[in-house]
Regions:
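N-terminal hydrophobic or amphipathic helices and topogenic motifs
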Residues: 1-33, 39-43, 58-63, 84-89, ...
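Short loop->beta-strand "edge-of-pocket" segments that line small-molecule binding or catalytic clefts
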Residues: 1-4, 90-110
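Ligand-binding cleft/hinge of the Venus flytrap
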Residues: 10-21, 102-104, 108-129
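A ligand-binding cleft/hinge motif common to bilobed small-molecule-binding domains
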Residues: 47-59, 140-170
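Periplasmic-binding protein-like
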Residues: 68-75, 159-177
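Flexible hinge/capping segments at coil-to-helix
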Residues: 69, 78-99
Length: 177
């Protein structure tokens, strides 16, 4: 569950193809839900990009081994040429900007909400903050289709949309728990 990517898909395929491997049944859930499933023993492993402290708080009392899989860049999906000149979370408060958010519980949303809090920015000042997409692909699609000016997600997804540019913000770590 949790996040998915080409690298993760390859790993899961190798695990199930191994002579001593078991079939891998995958469920796409946000980071909070997949860790909840792990905590209540409805899942055996979880892929997540939440930070280590968040992971440990969501599965208290359960011994975990975290396997660091890879780092990847996350940032803003914007129209080609970045006409709104978006470069930071502060720019999301511009009244001309309409944001497409991720759903509560996704690592992107958790990171963004934490960043807004650190910078003292109220979500009420961000037009579209309550608009939620369930994946990076759907949030990038919203910008591509001009339903929003900006969304926050993984750099790799921007490559699927020739009319989008990507503005990097930070790197996230993918873990297997």
């Amino acid at each position: 569950g949790g996040q998915t990517s080409a690298a993760l898909e390859l790993l899961l395929g190798k695990m199930s193809a191994h002579p001593e491997g078991l079939p891998v049944l995958q469920s796409h859930m946000n980071d909070y839900n997949v860790l909840y499933s792990l905590y209540f023993e409805k899942a055996h492993i979880a892929a997540t990009s939440l930070d280590i402290d968040d992971i440990r708080h969501l599965v208290p009392g359960i011994p975990l081994i975290l396997l660091s899989l890879y780092k990847y860049s996350v940032g803003f999906y914007v129209q080609a040429g970045n006409p709104e000149k978006i470069s930071s979370v502060e720019d999301l408060t511009d009244p001309k900007v309409v944001f497409m958010n991720r759903e509560k519980g996704s690592a992107r949303r958790v990171y963004l909400d934490r960043l807004l809090k650190e910078r003292g920015i109220s979500s009420e000042k961000i037009s579209g903050y309550r608009n939620e997409a369930v994946s990076d692909m759907s949030s990038a699609s919203a910008v591509f289709e001009h339903r929003a000016n900006v969304a926050f997600g993984e750099e790799m997804i921007a490559r699927y949309f020739p009319g989008l540019d990507f503005v990097p913000v930070t790197d996230m770590q993918m873990y297997l728990a």
